[in-house]
From Swiss-Prot:
UniProt cross-references to CDD domains, sorted A to Z: PROF
Provenance organism: Mus musculus (Mouse)
Cell compartment(s), UniProt: Cytoplasm, Cytoskeleton; Nucleus
Protein name: Profilin-3
Family annotation (Gene3D superfamilies): Dynein light chain 2a, cytoplasmic
Predominant location: cytoplasm
Gene name of the encoded protein: Pfn3
Protein function: Binds to actin and affects the structure of the cytoskeleton. Binds to poly-L-proline, phosphatidylinositol 3-phosphate (PtdIns(3)P), phosphatidylinositol 4,5-bisphosphate (PtdIns(4,5)P2) and phosphatidylinositol 4-phosphate (PtdIns(4)P). Slightly reduces actin polymerization. May be involved in spermatogenesis.
One GO BP: actin cytoskeleton organization
Length: 137
């Protein structure tokens, strides 16, 4: 998809989504596009490496960081064939649902608005990564 800015705007039309980022995960582990001024623009290459790395056990026990915010993992099927989604929640008083979707070249990261249930984001990410996968093939 050539126009990530338009894609980000389209995703943010959903009032349940507060922030979104498209992040490369193979050759170029950086944020390709995100909401201007959004928290997810700060996702680091190291965080991408942890998300897509082979050691699933450690971050399931200790949690992980997304854009510097500590998160606890609720469900990890990010690298599972046919699913490709990880559900997490930020730690702290302002806990928000975070959902990460896996495509062949990029991760789609969504953060819900305060009070939005993670299951809603999970369904949205499944729909969005399905569309991205079709465009890549």
């Amino acid at each position: 998809m050539s126009d990530w800015k338009g894609y980000i705007s389209a995703v943010l039309r959903d009032q349940r989504i507060d922030d979104v980022a498209i992040v490369g995960h193979s050759d170029n582990r950086c944020v390709w596009a995100s909401r201007p001024g959004g928290l997810l623009a700060a996702i680091s290459p190291q965080e991408v490496g942890v998300l897509t790395g082979p050691d699933r056990h450690t971050f399931l026990q200790t949690g992980l960081s997304v854009a510097g915010r500590r998160c606890c993992v609720i469900r990890d099927y990010l690298l599972a064939e046919g699913d490709g989604v990880l559900d997490a929640r930020t730690k702290g008083l302002d806990g928000r649902a975070i959902c990460v979707g896996h495509t062949p070249r990029a991760l789609l990261v969504l953060m819900g608005r305060r009070g939005v249930h993670g299951g809603i984001l999970n369904k949205t990410v499944h729909d969005l990564i399905g569309g991205l996968r079709e465009q890549c093939s």
